[in-house]
Every structure is written in C-alpha cells, then in structure tokens.
A protein has these predicted regions:
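Nucleic-acid endonuclease domains
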Residues: 1-80, 84, 94-98, 107-283
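Conserved active-site neighborhood of enzyme catalytic/cofactor-binding cores
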Residues: 104
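Internal alpha-helical scaffold/solenoid segments in large eukaryotic proteins
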Residues: 87-88
Length: 283
C-alpha cells in the first residue's frame, strides 16, 4: 500500500514538473531556445531536423532540469548503462532504494497535414525483459523492480524547411536571426500504459506502439483506459502468441478487441481511439 501511495505521489509531481518545462526550453515566440552548436571560434552551426538528433539534443537540454527535479523531490537518477537499455532513467527513492520508477524520454512531431495527430512513440519492447520480468537483459533493473513505468514526452512542430539552411554558419551576434528547427513544444507525463495502443510501434520489431491523437495522448486516453495496467501487461505479454480460427481461417490475435473476446470479456472495454490521421474514431 505504501508503494502505491509513493507511485501516485511520483506521478503527480512528474506531471507537475512536465508543465514547467516550457520555461527555458522555448523562447517567447514558441521556437525552441536551442539554435545550434557553437565552436571555440564563436561560430554557430544550425541543428539538423533529423528526429534522432532533435531527440538527443532536447534530452541534453532537459537533463539539468531533471537532475534538479529529482534532487528536490527526494530521488536520485540512475542512467541506462547502454544506449539500447530500458529505461532512459531510473528514479530511485533516497529514503528507500527499493522504490524505483522507470522514466523514458519520448519525443515526436506533429504531422503537418494533420496537426491533431503526431507520428507516435515506441513504448519499449513487449518481448525480452517485458516477459521475463525478473531478468536484467537490456534493462537497467529487472522490470518487476520498478513500482511504475512512466513517459516524459514532448510533442513538437517542425519548422518549415524553407526557413532553415543547414549549410550556413552564423556568427554569435546573429544568434537571434537563426530559425529553430522545431517549435510549439508541448510536454506531458503519464504512465506508459495510459498512452499505449494495441498495435506494434515499428515494423517487425517487438515494440509497443502508442496512440497518435495528440488530444488523447495529453489526456492519457489510450486503448487500455477502461481496463488498466494489468490488462495492458497481459495483452502485450501475449501479443501475437495466441491463434484463433475465424471463418475457417487461423490468425494470431493482434487486436485488443479480439483478445478481450477470446478471454470472455466485452470487446467494447477496448477504448475507441482516433487511429486515422484524417480524424474520426477508428478501431
């Protein structure tokens, strides 16, 4: 019961922290405050709009704030030992080191043609450490050691590439004239299961996908909203492992509605989310 209270407390303060991140990260015109890289000769090189570069630089930009938040909240941060490890950060309670929270930093961009939607996130593996929860393969601590699994996310708009010249070098006195590669950054924090979809996040890899409606992400309205984390765990641990026969054909269960029906539950417990980038509810 004490751990449940600690988890609720951590969730509350992490959400509050996410609301403060706009200060210092975005300029008054809503552009990202980071303009580029500076060398020893005071030359500024603009940042590429490549999502991996933006994600890494934004992570570096946020890290001092994260350290301050952890220290002021009674936690210490343990970073992942390897790049492909889950999670990005482990928050360990200073009072009780057995209390740990996984926090993954997630960034994605709004779709220019459908600004109510984003490109989505991958929410970690549904194989390996997710299934074998007492083992330490590709994870900082065993999955079961964590009292909660959280996302600290950023959704941003890409700046029109016509206003950015990645080959140009600026002098420091021209800093204010540099157009940032991203703008309109919105930060949020939630538990991982709250924004999960029932579909994989990236091709053939065993990653959990997120919902893509920005409104639903910010509200935590994933497909498991009516069901909770236990159903999220159960579904994704069994994703693609169960075969059913429909109309004489066999197929694997890869939809939550089918999984609920297979288990003898009302398929309508799976929340309907906006999957279509053109809008409108789709299952």
């Amino acid at each position: 019961m004490k751990v449940v209270r600690e988890k609720a407390h951590f969730k509350r303060i992490l959400k509050g922290f996410a609301k403060t991140l706009d200060v210092g990260v975005s300029a008054t015109d809503r552009q990202w405050a980071v303009k580029g890289f500076i060398d020893a000769f005071r030359n500024i090189y603009t940042i590429s709009a490549d999502t991996k570069i933006v994600s890494k630089v934004l992570e570096i930009h946020l890290f001092p704030k994260l350290l301050e938040f952890a220290m002021n909240s009674g936690y210490r941060i343990v970073l992942a030992d390897h790049q492909n490890y889950y999670p990005d950060m482990t928050f360990v309670s200073a009072k009780n080191e057995s209390v740990k929270f996984a926090v993954d930093l997630k960034t994605t961009y709004c779709l220019p043609r459908f600004p109510a939607f984003c490109n989505g996130f991958t929410l970690g593996s549904h194989g390996g450490y997710f299934k074998e929860r007492d083992k330490k393969k590709n994870i900082q601590f065993p999955y079961n050691d964590y009292a909660g699994h959280f996302c600290l996310g950023a959704i941003y708009s890409r700046t029109d590439s016509g206003g950015i010249d990645e080959t140009r070098i600026f002098k420091i006195d021209k800093l204010k004239s540099i157009v940032s590669v991203i703008k309109d950054i919105r930060f949020f924090a939630c538990e991982k299961w709250e924004i999960a979809s029932d579909s994989q996040g990236s091709g053939n890899t065993a990653n959990i996908g997120s919902i893509v409606s920005i409104k639903d992400i910010l509200a935590g309205n994933g497909v498991f909203k009516k069901l909770g984390e236990r159903w999220f765990d159960d579904y994704w641990m069994n994703y693609g492992e169960i075969t059913i026969t429909q109309e004489g054909k066999q197929r694997k269960i890869t939809k939550l509605r089918d999984y609920l029906e297979f288990k003898g539950y009302d398929p309508n417990l799976a929340c309907t989310v906006n999957r279509s980038k053109k809008g409108g509810p789709h299952e």
